[in-house]
């Protein structure tokens, strides 16, 4: 039973959370929450699963996002609520961010290899 509380900043395994999207909604219900916002870091991939589970067990799921942005030599995270997880512009931006992160990781691995660090 819900006590009317909400949590508007939840992460799933689609970013750095512990629970899958469905498990997160189940945990929200177990804790008596009426609604949650799924706001994964730079990902909307968990929203459909969470929304479906929410409809099934009567927990409102707000589709959201925690968007990483670079500002003045630092990073700022912007929370967005009631987003369209199928918006082509948004999906293109998220894909571009993902590709940039993968390229950065490859360069780090190359540098470590150049330094003689054994990686498996």
Feature roles, as predicted:
Residues 1-74:
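An N-terminally biased module of ancient metal coordination in phosphate/nucleic-acid-related enzymes
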Residues 56-120:
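Extended substrate/RNA-proximal surfaces in nucleic-acid metabolism proteins
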